[in-house]
From Swiss-Prot:
The gene is rplJ. This is Large ribosomal subunit protein uL10. Coiled coil: none annotated. The lineage of its organism: Bacteria, Thermotogati, Thermotogota, Thermotogae, Petrotogales. It holds the Pfam family Ribosomal_L10. It comes from Petrotoga mobilis (strain DSM 10674 / SJ95). InterPro entries: Ribosomal_uL10 (IPR001790), Ribosomal_uL10-like_sf (IPR043141), Ribosomal_uL10_bac (IPR022973), Ribosomal_uL10_bac_type (IPR047865), Ribosomal_uL10_CS_bac (IPR002363).
Amino acid sequence: MLTKERKKSLIDSFIYALESSPVILFVDFSGMSVLESNDFRLELYKNFGKDVVFTVYRTSLLKTAVKLANKELEDFEKFFEGSTGVIYAEESDPVDVLKAVKKFSESHNNKPFIKGGVLEGKIFDAAKAEEYAKLPSKQELYATVVRSLNSPISGLVNALSGNLRKVVYVINAIKEKK
């Protein structure tokens, strides 16, 4: 049985996550063994360190936290059915977190199943979670932008060096004739 202090601590941690985390995922972990659950936690730790947390809350505590955070309980109740685990991140890229959870889920018979969550303050369902998991991460987008910015510069360098090579060939040809 949880003490009042422990309940308050859990409620406060979830309220903090609701207010500050860029991504919160609600997952159904029913049917997962303790070993699979530990493997899942370990996988999150390997990918994100201590930044991503997977916690299981009592439904009553989640509902209380949502009310205390001045959020609409109706928006969240669909996530609180069944065995609900909560995953939240402090600074990690939300898309990377979604991809990691989806990848683990696909390799473990769709367990845990993403019910939905909150991304940058917007609530989304399982279908949107699938779409978000297909998006490129921030790092992939940065790489694409850098490549596209680098392409014209590379082309200019190649064009200029090509002209210099032609000048060198012409000078060498003149030198050989003399």
